[in-house]
Amino acid sequence: MDRKINFLDTSLRSNYKKHITNKNFDVLIIGGGITGAGICLDAASRGLSVCLIEMNDFASGTSSKSTKLIHGGLRYLEQFKFRLVHETGSERAILHNLAPHIVKPEKMLLPIVKNGKLNKFSTRAALLVYDYLANVKGKDRNKVLTKSQILNKEPLLKNNNLLGGAVYSEYRTDDSRLTIDLIKKSIDYGACPINYIKGEEFTYSRKGSINGIKCSDKLSDNLMNINSKVIINASGSWTDEVLKGRSKKLVLSKGIHVVVSRKKFNINQSLYFDAIDSRMIFAIPRGDTVYIGTTDTKFEHGKDKLHILESVVEYLIE
C-alpha cells in the first residue's frame, strides 16, 4: 500500500474505506485495544498486509482503564506459576527496552505486618525468585528494609503492626497512549487501522470458509465488506458478541479502582499491601490523585451499563 496514507487522519476517512474494501488482506484484526494493536504491529512488521477495525475509539475499553502497570507477575509465585512469571517478566523487559519513554520502572513498597500474608523470610525468598525469573537487573532489583527504613519512606503506614518491608520494581505506563503508539508504529509498516467500524457478521467463500467481515461505519451507517485470509478476534470482553454463539461463553470479571485526591491520601510512593481478605492491593500515585485497586469480581451486567456496588468501594477504602 501507499505508506504516505495516514489512517489516523479523519479528513481522509473516505479514502481509507475505499482502500480497505478494495484489498484482500493477509490479516484482519477485530479490536483496537492493546492486544489488537500489538498483533497489528507484529504482523505488519513481518511484511503481512494488515487491517484493524475498532467499533469505538482506539483503547476505549480496558486498555484505557487499567491500573497503568506492566505487571511482572509477582502474585503468580504463590501459585507456583514460575514459567508465567518468567514469560511476563521477559516480555516486560522487551517492552521497556523498546519504549522507555512510556514504560518506566515504578518502585513498589511492600510492607510486612504482624499476622499478614507475608513474613520477612517468605518475602525475601519470593522477591529473589521474582528478580531471577523476571530478569530484573541492576538498580531495579529488590531490597529488604527494616521497620525504620520503611517508615522513613512512607510515614503514613501504621507503626504498631509493622515489622519491616521491601522495595521491588514494577513498570508503569500510560495504557491508552501505549496502545496508540503501537497503532501509529504499525502504520509505518503499512497497516490499515480504522476506528468506528463495527464488524456485523462474517462473510463466507463458496466453499463455506470465512473470508471476511461485513461491517458498518458508525459515523455514516454505511455497510462495507473487508476481505482477509485470516481473521483474529482481539475484541476482549466483546468476544462473544463477535462470535455470536460459535464458541463457549466467556466468564467475564470486573475490576474497579477508587481514585482519591492525593491531598486526602498523600503517600510518597506506590504501595502493594494486604487487604482485609489477604488479597494484594495497589495504591499508586498519579499526579494529583492516587489509584487504589483493583478488585476481581464476576461480571454479569451489560458492558455498556457498568454498575459499581458501594460494598466493593468500601472494601478498597478499608
Located regions from the model:
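Extreme N-terminal leader/targeting segments of oxidoreductases
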Residues: 1-27, 42-46
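Short linear elements at protein peripheries
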Residues: 30, 130-161, 165-181
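Glycine-rich Rossmann-fold phosphate-binding loop(s) that bind the pyrophosphate
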Residues: 32-33, 55
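N-terminal Rossmann-fold NAD(P) dinucleotide-binding loop
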Residues: 36
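Active-site substrate-recognition segment that forms the wall
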Residues: 42, 53, 101-105, 225-229, ...
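Glycine-rich FAD pyrophosphate-binding loop
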Residues: 45-64
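Dinucleotide-binding Rossmann-like beta1-alpha1 core, especially the glycine-rich loop
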Residues: 68-153
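Helical element adjacent to the flavin cofactor pocket in flavoenzyme catalytic cores
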Residues: 166-225, 229
